[in-house]
Curated annotation (Swiss-Prot):
<dbReference type="GO" id="GO:0005737">
    <property type="term" value="C:cytoplasm"/>
</dbReference>
<comment type="similarity">
    <text>Belongs to the gamma-glutamyl phosphate reductase family.</text>
</comment>
<dbReference type="InterPro" id="IPR012134">
    <property type="entry name" value="Glu-5-SA_DH"/>
</dbReference>
<dbReference type="GO" id="GO:0055129">
    <property type="term" value="P:L-proline biosynthetic process"/>
</dbReference>
<keyword id="KW-0560">Oxidoreductase</keyword>
<dbReference type="GO" id="GO:0004350">
    <property type="term" value="F:glutamate-5-semialdehyde dehydrogenase activity"/>
</dbReference>
<comment type="function">
    <text>Catalyzes the NADPH-dependent reduction of L-glutamate 5-phosphate into L-glutamate 5-semialdehyde and phosphate. The product spontaneously undergoes cyclization to form 1-pyrroline-5-carboxylate.</text>
</comment>
<keyword id="KW-0963">Cytoplasm</keyword>
<dbReference type="GO" id="GO:0050661">
    <property type="term" value="F:NADP binding"/>
</dbReference>
<dbReference type="Pfam" id="PF00171">
    <property type="entry name" value="Aldedh"/>
</dbReference>
<keyword id="KW-0028">Amino-acid biosynthesis</keyword>
<dbReference type="InterPro" id="IPR016161">
    <property type="entry name" value="Ald_DH/histidinol_DH"/>
</dbReference>
<protein>
    <recommendedName>
        <fullName>Gamma-glutamyl phosphate reductase</fullName>
        <ecNumber>1.2.1.41</ecNumber>
    </recommendedName>
</protein>
<dbReference type="InterPro" id="IPR016163">
    <property type="entry name" value="Ald_DH_C"/>
</dbReference>
<comment type="pathway">
    <text>Amino-acid biosynthesis; L-proline biosynthesis; L-glutamate 5-semialdehyde from L-glutamate: step 2/2.</text>
</comment>
<dbReference type="InterPro" id="IPR020593">
    <property type="entry name" value="G-glutamylP_reductase_CS"/>
</dbReference>
<keyword id="KW-0521">NADP</keyword>
Amino acid sequence: MDLTNMGIAAKDAAFHLATASTAQKNKALAIIADELEANAATILEANAKDIELGREAGLTDALLDRLLLNEERLTGIANDVRNVISLNDPVGSEIDSKALENGMSLSRRRVPLGVVGVIYEARPNVTIDIAALCLKTGNASILRGGKETFFSNMELVKVIQSALEKAELPAASVQYIEKPDRELVSQLLKLDDYVDMIIPRGGAGLHKMCKENSTIPVIIGGFGISHIFVDESADLEKSVDVVENSKVQRPSACNSLDTLLVHEAVAEAFLAKLTQRLAGKVTLVADARAKSLLAGFEDQRDAVEGDFDTEWLSYTLGVKVVADVAEAIDHMRVHNASHSDAIMTNSLESSERFINSVGSAAVYVNASTRFTDGAQFGLGAEVAVSTQKLHARGPMGLEELTSYKWVGKANYLVRG
């Protein structure tokens, strides 16, 4: 597989996409959504092969859940594409403008990034999410999914490229690296003549490899330990609801709860309520102070070194008792709080201190960490959740897939 030729084709496609009308891009997206549902049987059959091979390879239940497609999830993916159609196209919009003293009208206008390379693991829905958002913003994309999703992705890419042809857009607008060879990933990371941005979606190892080997700007996202701190002023009953939702709704998601921090003044009462709710569902990994309050809760073990640095992605939850909001914040600073973190409190002082001190991409007061999601934020599906500070942060929707150019208009103006 010649990635240089793929890069050349992608750059050419990006040139044409940059001037495609919103109507033409939306037409392609509408066809993708319809074809996903029309080809559901074929797509689900391919996904079943991936699931079977995953089980044979000993993948965890959490990974298999990420891999799984069913009719409900496929319909949801199609509807996410339709939602992207309904969103405003940012390309060509003016960010701001001003009139200069010399008579020039100067503005910043949104433009596509160009070619986006995305490397991701066992989530076939990512293939559609990325293709849809890149198409809407006039970007070409080169995708490389994990070997665990090979058969699913092959069928999904067929749907995408068929839709592109029907909408009279370049088929190379969305390309897929079919071979699982890691050497091809290394080659992709060096295609700086053709690719403008790399987005890795996966674990810490993938992010580290991309940062260390890429000659292309890399957006780091997805990985991070998510925390909830239950303050002494919190409504304990409602806090139990939020903690349960953050942990149990979809534990394999990157915004699911990893570590629970509880103020010592309410730890005994709160953990008693929480353990009743989580019994039979979640394994607690407790520090010494929390352990002393968990007598009688069967599914628990002592926390060891590294546990509070673990993104569980499963029905496991770290628990620690802290003295106050300051200790909670200090713990989070040490243990990679960069994704989604929340405080349960009725204290304005505590909430503002938490918001201003915690360095995460998304910070919540009295809300679940599960809200860090493009659709939940009204952005449509996202290509990633960025946990860095440049070029984008948090869920990356349409605007985050654009750059801008300066546009100056004048009456044959010359510089004096």
